Amino acid sequence: MRHYEIVFIVHPDQSEQVPAMIDRYKSIVTARNGQIHRLEDWGRRQLAYPIQKVHKAHYVLMNIECDGEALGELEHAFKFNDAVLRHLTIKMKKAVTTPSPMMKEEKSRSLTPAAGDEGKPAEAAEA
């Protein structure tokens, strides 16, 4: 079995359906004795350029280990799902389980207060 990294972008109007989509795609991989090494839901983000007149989309990253049949079935599911705007599959040399740079950035943002937030309590105390 080979290792793959898959990123797919979902139409923002279908964001509520993303957990169900993830479950369906996970079941496709696991039904053929594949494994999911990393699954990250990056949420709604700005696109670099509009796709179908949409400027934001919901991003999901999956690192999987599966055979060619499971990958073909997964890509077939992406192609025939109108909510999936784009998908990209990259063959990897080994399984990747560490958090992606996008998740590390998100975590560091949540741990450090924003620059604009530091000045607000002082202004409120003066008033």
From Swiss-Prot:
List the GO biological process terms. translation
State the name under which the record lists this protein: Small ribosomal subunit protein bS6
Positions of region (Disordered): 96-127
Q: List the GO terms this entry assigns under cellular component, sorted alphabetically.
A: cytosolic small ribosomal subunit
Organism expressing this protein natively: Azoarcus sp. (strain BH72)
Q: Which GO MF terms does the UniProt record name?
A: small ribosomal subunit rRNA binding; structural constituent of ribosome
Q: Which family does it belong to?
A: Belongs to the bacterial ribosomal protein bS6 family.
In this chain, composition skew of type Basic and acidic residues spans: 117-127
Q: Keywords on this record? A: Ribonucleoprotein, Ribosomal protein, RNA-binding, rRNA-binding
> Mind telling me which SUPFAM superfamilies this protein's record contains?
Ribosomal protein S6 (SSF54995)
Q: Which CDD domains match?
A: bS6 (cd00473)
- Give the gene name: rpsF
What role does this protein play? Answer: Binds together with bS18 to 16S ribosomal RNA.
Q: List the Pfam families.
A: Ribosomal_S6
